């Protein structure tokens, strides 16, 4: 029997063993999570790698279809870096985390005294492994496994949530809602979404009475800091499309809003609560699924919404605040239960955990402009960083500065 016959027999066996694909999106996400857990079985994988590699683009003989593989699956390298690219053009990843996309901000005038802050997204094309501009969406959240993203259309608040196929670029299906939604966020298992509802577009701006950016002209637009139009949140079962809305009380202190005009909800670490930031202490507020305020979970008591990385995968460590000096950068790693500093790592701002010892952060080169940050990989117990992207250009708020969107691959 020659090599071609061996491959064909192998494909027939694989096709016969595979159960029919169901329509459930959640099943696909869970499959992606199982693939990540099984990555450690390296010996068995190495023994079969040659056959799998040959079989990738070969049609399944019984079905006439091609096996689908994502760009994030084709390159399973621990670190995929492009330190010469800013904004990124090609896939960036470390460990189980990848840069799923990024967005830039722009201010679009709607009248003499009003404007709206808009986002322009570049999303990873899972067919080519490149970041491609997609102007259709105002908000994006990428599911674990990076096959699907939840999206909102440009006009906010939106009355439907789209599930975008990141391989084809097409909408898989729409989930309609009765109340306007302006943000979406996946749970860590990809089975649910929390969608924040607003009565008005939270990205609307008004003309400032002073010269905010110091350029000598009074042409700046700012959010309405004293007002919040947030009304509550939907819990969305992704597989069935069922939704449940809960109202949340206004967050005010002496009749002034203590949340930003856009202050979106996300899930707690274990997915049993939802949370959002506050502009004042205690900096985070948690809610049960009925919209009632509850105490912070014990292992999230010392977290703050301004530090994006939050808990390590095993829950034993938490990302802390900036801990650098006048000429050095650094950030804390703390005990999530006590708030005590356990470690100090490089980095201006900790963005996401890669594993239990490594994180992706914004950081600058020694002596560089504080706004010229690049994505870097930092490791607990090491002063060495590995640059993953090129550096941002311009100062804070300058056109073209990009903001990363991460997801597990």
Residue spans for each PLM region:
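Non-cleavable N-terminal signal-anchor transmembrane helices
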Residues: 52-150, 154, 355
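Loop/turn position at the start of each blade in beta-propeller repeats
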Residues: 86, 135-137, 179-181, 260-262, ...
